[in-house]
């Protein structure tokens, strides 16, 4: 599991794209020229940006070679760069920085977010969506299984919180619109939940394990999911998935 798997990620493409659609709908910009899609993945969010602003110069940034290759194949009219978001520098100031489900993987948001604001033109917008599920059973159980099986903590940090992000971005000279939404995804089985998180949140926990260790981890994880997520009357499972949204417009 040395690289991200675009096919596995796109298995739940509709569910993963819905927050991007809803974030984009709140971006208060019309005619813009320079756009960056940070953590563009296989290009599903970049495609939405390209549809809204077909004349804009859109650059997708991702650290995964596999994701960049998939995005280039899907969107030949857009530019894609393999780079670390923290180190990438645009050639010109940006009108929009769009980051759908990517910045949660990076540390030091107290430094990262002001840095991203500094890359914007005056009146430019930083639009961010981040999964806020660190305390959801899906992610709590990852940590519990790792502790049971004596594996080191590989999970990402929790988010800073709504009030912290408001202060960070206000102090960086932005007008801030911030909200939190919980989606309830209908899942056909507990294995489907594992398939979902294996492409993203579970990946760091598994990537350094031998195949036999991965199977032990996943077997125990499946057992614990069954305890935490009961079946509905129709046999479906409702997977709660909170997400934090931020639209910050630079005013300084």
UniProtKB/Swiss-Prot annotation:
- GO CC annotation: cytoplasm
> Known Pfam families for this protein?
Methyltransf_25
The protein here is known as Trans-aconitate 2-methyltransferase
PANTHER family attached to this UniProt entry? TRANS-ACONITATE 2-METHYLTRANSFERASE, TRANS-ACONITATE 2-METHYLTRANSFERASE-RELATED
Enzyme Commission number(s): 2.1.1.144
Q: Which GO terms describe its biological process?
A: methylation
Example GO molecular function: trans-aconitate 2-methyltransferase activity
Return the similarity comment.
Belongs to the methyltransferase superfamily. Tam family.
Q: Which organism is it from?
A: Escherichia coli (strain 55989 / EAEC)
Keyword check for Transferase: yes
Against InterPro entries, the record matches this protein to:
Methyltransf_25, SAM-dependent_MTases_sf, Trans-aconitate_MeTrfase, Trans_acon_MeTrfase_C
| Class of enzymatic activity (EC top level) | transferase
Q: Provide this UniProt record's keywords sorted from A to Z.
A: Cytoplasm, Methyltransferase, S-adenosyl-L-methionine, Transferase
Instruction: Please give the catalytic activity noted in the UniProt record.
Output: trans-aconitate + S-adenosyl-L-methionine = (E)-3-(methoxycarbonyl)pent-2-enedioate + S-adenosyl-L-homocysteine
């Amino acid at each position: 599991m040395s690289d991200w798997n675009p096919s596995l990620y796109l298995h739940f493409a509709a569910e993963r794209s819905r927050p991007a659609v809803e974030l984009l709908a709140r971006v208060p910009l019309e005619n813009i020229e320079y756009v960056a899609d940070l953590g563009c993945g296989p290009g599903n969010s970049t495609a939405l940006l390209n549809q809204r602003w077909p004349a804009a110069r859109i650059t997708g940034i991702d650290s995964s070679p596999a994701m960049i290759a998939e995005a280039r194949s899907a969107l030949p009219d857009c530019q894609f760069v393999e780079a670390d978001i923290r180190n990438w520098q645009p050639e010109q100031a940006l009108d929009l920085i769009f980051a759908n489900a990517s910045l949660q993987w990076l540390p030091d948001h107290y430094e990262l977010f002001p840095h991203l604001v500094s890359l914007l033109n005056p009146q430019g917008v930083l639009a961010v969506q981040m999964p806020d599920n660190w305390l959801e059973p899906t992610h709590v159980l990852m940590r519990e299984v790792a502790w049971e099986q004596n594996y080191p903590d590989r999970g990402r940090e929790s988010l800073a919180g709504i009030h912290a992000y408001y202060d960070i971005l206000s102090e960086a000279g932005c007008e801030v619109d911030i909200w939190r939404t919980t989606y309830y995804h209908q899942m056909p089985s507990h294995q489907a939940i594992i398939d979902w998180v294996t492409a993203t949140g579970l990946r760091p926990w598994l990537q350094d394990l031998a195949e036999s260790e991965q199977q032990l981890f996943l077997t125990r994880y499946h057992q614990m999911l069954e305890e935490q997520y009961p079946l509905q009357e129709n046999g479906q499972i409702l997977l709660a998935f909170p997400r934090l949204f931020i639209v910050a417009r630079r005013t300084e």
